[in-house]
Swiss-Prot record:
Cofactor(s) listed in the protein's UniProt record: Mg(2+)
Key word Metal-binding present: yes
Protein name, UniProt field: Crossover junction endodeoxyribonuclease RuvC
Assembly with partners or alone: Homodimer which binds Holliday junction (HJ) DNA. The HJ becomes 2-fold symmetrical on binding to RuvC with unstacked arms; it has a different conformation from HJ DNA in complex with RuvA. In the full resolvosome a probable DNA-RuvA(4)-RuvB(12)-RuvC(2) complex forms which resolves the HJ.
One biological process term in Gene Ontology: DNA recombination
Active site per the UniProt annotation: D7, E68, D141
GO cellular component: cytoplasm; Holliday junction resolvase complex
Cofactor binding comment, as recorded: Binds 2 Mg(2+) ion per subunit.
Upper lineage: Bacteria, Bacillati, Actinomycetota, Actinomycetes, Frankiales
Annotated region described as Disordered, given as residue ranges: 165-197
Amino acid sequence: MRVLGVDPGLTRCGLGVVDGALGSRARLVEAGVVRTPAGAEVADRLRAVADGIDAWLDRTRPDAVAVEKVFSQANVRTVMGTAQAGAVAIMLAARRDLPVGLYTPSEVKAAVTGSGRADKAQVGFMVTRLLGLAEVPRPADAADALALALCHLWRGPALARLRAAAPAAPVSRPAPATPARRSPRPAAPARRPAGAS
């Protein structure tokens, strides 16, 4: 199986491709980044990210794509750019009918290092060991993308089997609204004729 990992970002979008199969060592195919200038319009930057990812999809022909899930950060502008670049990667994969795995940073760290609290240096070190590389891939965004690809290589097939085994949830439709019934008014007491006792 060949997986393209995408560490989304507007300034640097990390990309990493690995090959692997159950019981064999994963192999590096390619790693790098797509860069966009910080001063450019967001639309132009997203187009550059899309063009870069598209070129990688054409060149490396992955079987699946793994994208980092956006998590909450204090810097809203950073979160927005990351989310937008991630959405571009997901859309490009969907256009090619490629399965997409979404993983949080802690899921990726746990898959690669055994600890969801690992730092970037530990992730880079383990990616280097797992892929049998001579040095840590640079920049860190490329190493993170490779970690995403490795995470999907190991977890993706199991998650797909779980989804396939789970019974399909019935589609619930809202019940049609029924008009509220009014309870009948109690009848007014009969009036007695004047002078009746």
